[in-house]
C-alpha cells in the first residue's frame, strides 16, 4: 500500500488533539457532516485532504492563531500557506499595501478625486488577488469530491491558508466601495473573477468586539499599514454581510426573487458579529446583495442591467457551497488555537484525485511560502 505523509507523521497532532478533548486526530480533523456512500468509487480509495481558510478582517489575530495551530503538527502533517507578502511588496508591485492606505488617506484629505482613487485601488486589488487566484487554479485539479463516509481515515494532509481568494476578490473591494475609493462596477468585475468554489472549502471567519479589535490592530506592526478606523468598520461590516449571505443562500434564499424587498440605495448599517448557521435565514437586506442596489448599476426602469445581474448570479454560485465557521477571537492566543482545533472536527475533507496529489500539493504550498511568504 502506498504511504502518504499524514499517515506517517500523525502522532504529534494526535497527541495535541487528545490533550484538548479529542480522542484522536481522526475525530479532531475528520468531518462529521458526511453521508454514507452506497458504493465505493475509485476516487474514494484516494487519501483525503483537509483545507482550512482562515479569513476575516485584518488585525483579529488570524496569523498568530494559525501559526500556533500549525506548530501542533509535524512538518509533513500540516502545512501553512501564508499571506503572499513578498508578492505584494516586491514581486507583483512595489509596496502595494502602503499604496492602498496612502491612496485612501489622500482621498479622505481631499487631495485626489474618487475617480483617481478608484483607478489606483482597482489596480492594487488585482495585485492583491493574483497569488490567491492562480494558486487556487493550480490546486484545483487535485481536489476530488467531498469525503462521503463517516468512517473516513484522518486526512493525509491538512492545508491551512491565510485567507481565501474571496478576501481580495470580494471582501476588500466591497469595503473599499463603502469607503468611496472603488466603484460598484469594479467590485462586480472582481466578483466575476472569483474562481469556482472547490469541494471541501472550509472558511473560518472571526468574531471579536470592536473595541478589542481596535486595540489589537493598534498594537500590530505591518509594513505599509495605517490605523484606519473607518476602513476597519467597513471590512467588519462586509465580513458580517458575507456570513449572512452564505446563510441566506444555504437557507434557500434567491436574490432574484427577493430583490424587490430592497428599498432605496442606502448602505446597510453597522451589523453584528458574524453568526454561525444557527437561526433563521437572514433578510436579503442583511446580505452582500444589498450593496449592489446602487444607481450606477440600475437601468432607467430601476432593474439591474443584465451584465451586473449575471455577476450577482456568479456571487451566489460561488458562496453557496462554502462551509463557514465562526471563531471567537476574544480569548488568549492559546485559547484561539484550541478553539480552532475544535472547529476542525466539523470540517469537510475531500479526496485527492491521483496517488501523487498529496506530495504535489505539499510542494505547491511550500513553494508558495518560500517564494512569497513574509520572511523573504
UniProtKB/Swiss-Prot annotation:
Residues 19-32 have a biased composition (Basic residues). The active site is at residue 83. Substrate binds at residues 101, 125, 222. GO terms for molecular function: ATP binding; thymidine kinase activity. It comes from the Viruses. Keywords: ATP-binding, DNA synthesis, Early protein, Kinase, Nucleotide-binding, Transferase. It is an enzyme of class 2 (transferase). Its EC number is 2.7.1.21. GO terms for biological process: DNA biosynthetic process; TMP biosynthetic process. ATP binds at residues 56-63, 216. Pfam families: Herpes_TK (PF00693). Residues 1-44, 260-280 are annotated as: Disordered. Used in molecular biology as a selectable marker to identify transfected eukaryotic cells. Used in cancer suicide gene therapy to selectively kill transformed cells. Residues 33-44 have a biased composition (Basic and acidic residues). Belongs to the herpesviridae thymidine kinase family. Phosphorylates and thereby activates certain drugs like acyclovir (ACV), valacyclovir, and famciclovir to a toxic form, that leads to successful suppression of the infection, while the uninfected cell does not have this ability because it lacks TK. Mutations in thymidine kinase may induce HSV resistance to antiviral therapies in immunocompromised patients. The most frequently observed resistant strains are unable to express TK and are avirulent in animal models of disease. Homodimer. Catalyzes the transfer of the gamma-phospho group of ATP to thymidine to generate dTMP in the salvage pathway of pyrimidine synthesis. The dTMP serves as a substrate for DNA polymerase during viral DNA replication. Allows the virus to be reactivated and to grow in non-proliferative cells lacking a high concentration of phosphorylated nucleic acid precursors. This is Thymidine kinase. It comes from Human herpesvirus 1 (strain SC16). The lineage of its organism: Viruses, Duplodnaviria, Heunggongvirae, Peploviricota, Herviviricetes.
